[in-house]
Amino acid sequence: MRALIVDDSRFVRSFLRGLLEQRGVECEEAGDGQAALDRIHSSAPFDLALVDWNMPVMNGLEMVERIRAEGYRDIKVLMVTTEAEDDYIVRSLNAGADEYLMKPFDDAALGDKLAMMGVEIAAS
C-alpha cells in the first residue's frame, strides 16, 4: 500500500505519516496540490491520497478534480481538513474524493474512515 500525504503543514504530514507507517503503509509527502500532481505523474502508483483542502499553489479540491479528470480513478482520496461546513463536504465528494475526515482526529477515526473506503491496512 502506497499513500501520498498532501498538506501544507509539515506537522500534519509527519503526524499522518507516523500513523500510516505504523500500519505498514509506504508514504510520500507533498506540501501543495501541484507538488502532489507532480509526484503522481512521476512516481510509482499510489493507492491512497490524504489531502488537505486549504493549501498554497493548488488547493486540495482542485487537485482532486485534476487527478480524476486525468484518469487516476484507482487512487482512493480522503480529504483531511478543518473545513466543517456541509458545502465543503459536498464539493469534495462531487470533485471525486471518496471520504472526508475532520481535523483534529485520532488513529481510530482515521482507521474507521479508511475501512469505510475499503482501504485494507494493518491495525495499529
Name each model-derived stretch.
Residues S14-Q22:
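Charged docking surfaces used in two-component/phosphorelay signaling
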Residues E29-L48:
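Acidic, metal-coordinating helix/loop segments flanking the phosphotransfer/catalytic sites
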Residues M55:
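Receiver (REC) domain active-site loop signature in two-component systems and cognate sites
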Residues F105-L114:
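C-terminal output helix
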